[in-house]
């Protein structure tokens, strides 16, 4: 006998684009306005907190790729949706949005980090591709090896700087907020600072764009495959089609680290902007 069909909303969004990022924050931080500005979504915006009731996906365009941004319901000191952990499972990072004009914004940062820690979700300062000198190292003995914890590299977005004209200095902001998260002063009202998010995500997540071509034809330069730094020709072949990956013999590559049309093996590491022509057995 089959079980009953599951009913109710699905709180996990299937990842699309180069990476999925979760947008989290306290009520009235302007995170839904930020999501709408960045993605053109129809995220509901209201004067009162808790306007967002379910995950709202949207796509942030950066050059020839896109990042998927998921606007999640706000986190309050006395309430957080029970399905929040499930919603964060596919995410590769987070944008923590606070209202810099709110005197309690420092407490909000600590509160949200604490509430998520209770659910074994760690908002961490370190991004793989950002300067390690500007980031706090992770205690690898006590944290990084914990298989039951979700680690999300986090960008702190100090929103509503249009309401606090002294908030443009990121160093002063970081000192004021008492955090080592990478920090961006921004405004979802006039867009100040928001054009920096795409480049930061691209660098921080070590995204590599790889273009493919068919023998005898020009490369397909409008829709790159996206992988992480250190990925190989075989990794890209798996994205193209599992049968191609299974019968891959070699590839010809064009890029800054190879001669034009150089023959490379399946384990050849790829760089951003490389073009590959896959050859099968």
Locate each region found by the language model.
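Conserved G1/Walker A P-loop phosphate-binding module
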Residues: 1-106, 114
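A short, terminal or domain-edge coil/loop segment
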Residues: 59-64, 100, 104-108, 113, ...
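Generic structural hydrophobic/aromatic packing signal, biased to beta-strands
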Residues: 60, 69, 112, 210-212, ...
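Short, glycine/charged-enriched secondary-structure capping and boundary segments
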Residues: 37-38, 82-85, 109-112, 169-173, ...
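Conserved Switch II/interswitch segment of TRAFAC-class P-loop GTPases
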Residues: 75-77, 89-139, 161-167, 191
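C-terminal-of-GTPase-core extension/linker across diverse P-loop GTPases
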Residues: 1-19, 24, 29, 125-281
């Amino acid at each position: 006998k089959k079980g009953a069909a599951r009913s109710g909303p699905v709180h996990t969004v299937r990842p699309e684009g180069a990476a999925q990022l979760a947008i989290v924050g306290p009520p009235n931080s302007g995170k839904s306005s930020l999501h709408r500005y960045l993605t053109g979504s129809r995220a509901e915006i209201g004067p009162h907190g808790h306007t967002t009731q379910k995950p709202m996906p949207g796509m942030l365009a950066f050059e020839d790729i896109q990042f998927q941004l998921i606007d999640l319901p706000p986190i309050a000191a006395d309430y957080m949706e029970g399905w929040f952990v499930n919603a964060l499972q596919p995410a590769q990072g987070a944008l923590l949005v606070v209202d810099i004009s709110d005197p309690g914004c420092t407490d909000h940062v600590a509160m949200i980090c604490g509430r998520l820690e209770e659910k074994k979700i760690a908002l961490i300062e370190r991004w793989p591709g950002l300067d390690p000198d500007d980031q706090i190292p992770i205690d690898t003995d006590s944290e990084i090896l914990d298989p039951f914890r979700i680690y999300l590299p986090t960008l702190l977005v100090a929103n509503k700087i249009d309401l606090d004209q002294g908030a443009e200095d990121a160093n002063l902001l970081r000192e004021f907020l008492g955090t080592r998260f990478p920090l961006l002063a921004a405004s979802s009202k006039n867009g100040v600072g928001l054009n920096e998010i795409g480049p930061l995500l691209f660098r921080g997540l070590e995204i590599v764009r790889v273009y493919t071509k068919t023998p005898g034809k020009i490369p397909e330069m409008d829709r790159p495959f996206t992988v992480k730094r250190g990925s190989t020709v075989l990794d890209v072949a798996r994205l193209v089609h599992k049968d191609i990956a299974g019968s891959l013999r070699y590839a010809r590559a064009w890029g800054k680290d190879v001669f034009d049309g150089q023959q490379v093996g399946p384990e050849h590491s790829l760089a951003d902007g490389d073009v590959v022509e896959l050859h099968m057995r």
